[in-house]
Amino acid sequence: MPFGNTHNKYKLNYKSEEEYPDLSKHNNHMAKVLTPDLYKKLRDKETPSGFTLDDVIQTGVDNPGHPFIMTVGCVAGDEESYTVFKDLFDPIIQDRHGGFKPTDKHKTDLNHENLKGGDDLDPHYVLSSRVRTGRSIKGYTLPPHCSRGERRAVEKLSVEALNSLTGEFKGKYYPLKSMTEQEQQQLIDDHFLFDKPVSPLLLASGMARDWPDARGIWHNDNKSFLVWVNEEDHLRVISMEKGGNMKEVFRRFCVGLQKIEEIFKKAGHPFMWNEHLGYVLTCPSNLGTGLRGGVHVKLAHLSKHPKFEEILTRLRLQKRGTGGVDTAAVGSVFDISNADRLGSSEVEQVQLVVDGVKLMVEMEKKLEKGQSIDDMIPAQK
């Protein structure tokens, strides 16, 4: 799929209604918000780095969405996108993040000691635990918009920072372009590496340009702390391990992430953050904490229960298939994670996962014995 809004200035030769995209068959947040009037109002605006409204919406125009899955349908190209195009982004953010208003403030809490429990999820059911987030480096444009030189500068800065980590975080960087096909596939299968850029969302937004130039993965020596460089975000920071010790996974996540943040600050490149949106990331769905705390959990009986979906909704959790977004569950193993990102803290979001998964495992055990779980259905969180 070709990408390029290089003729944005040229588009202004045509009337706004002649350029307005056909969104009649679309089911995404952008299409819900973008009226012809709003398009007209914003189409000649651009951010200081030159990102325009057409750049913001292209991925949502090319990917109408799914009848049952509401995609976001837009991206930011730089930190200023959320301000310059706030008339589009604010209603999308409010819709996507449970009514989070333009006046609301986000809260951050990376003190792992505030998490209660989490070290006792039953490993017979909980096969692995992971926490991830994204970070954007101030002073650079985001992946949908950055140039080759800029992307390489982000990689250089990131590798220098990561290579200075010590102790349990000591590790090594592996650039994508020097990996063999086999090495890449092995890392993807082990859930360590991002997939090749075949996702239409990635392609249509321009994030896959120049692939695999300046992309790579850094991980510590025992592969429990990983950083992806220059995929959908400048950095994706991941803490993971087999089994159900979410407490330890979250501790390593918080400690490692704060170490990295400190190094970037000292280098004069703090992460993009503001008190309204929290951590600023490429996709509006990740604003706030950018955090997804997830477990792979085996729920052979509960997943067939008529109230499974309702239970997840009430616990503020979401399910994905075993291989992540848009994949099926293999052997009744689901990827269960927090549904929220914005308006609540990292600790609160992981707490919901820990408490919710614990309850679902108890339910699964009851159903195995042929007992009813009706008295265990939780109230809406």
Curated annotation (Swiss-Prot):
Residue ranges annotated for the Phosphagen kinase N-terminal domain, each copy included: 11-98
In-chain residues carrying the UniProt-annotated modification Phosphoserine: 164, 178, 199, 372
Modified residues (Phosphothreonine): 166, 180, 313, 322
EC identifiers of the protein: 2.7.3.2
Any one GO CC term of the record: extracellular space
InterPro entries: ATP-guanido_PTrfase (IPR000749), ATP-guanido_PTrfase_AS (IPR022415), ATP-guanido_PTrfase_cat (IPR022414), ATP-guanido_PTrfase_N (IPR022413), ATP-guanido_PTrfase_N_sf (IPR036802), Gln_synth/guanido_kin_cat_dom (IPR014746)
Broad enzyme group: transferase
Residue ranges of domain Phosphagen kinase C-terminal in the record: 125-367
Function: Reversibly catalyzes the transfer of phosphate between ATP and various phosphogens (e.g. creatine phosphate). Creatine kinase isoenzymes play a central role in energy transduction in tissues with large, fluctuating energy demands, such as skeletal muscle, heart, brain and spermatozoa.
Family: Belongs to the ATP:guanido phosphotransferase family.
Designated name of the protein: Creatine kinase M-type
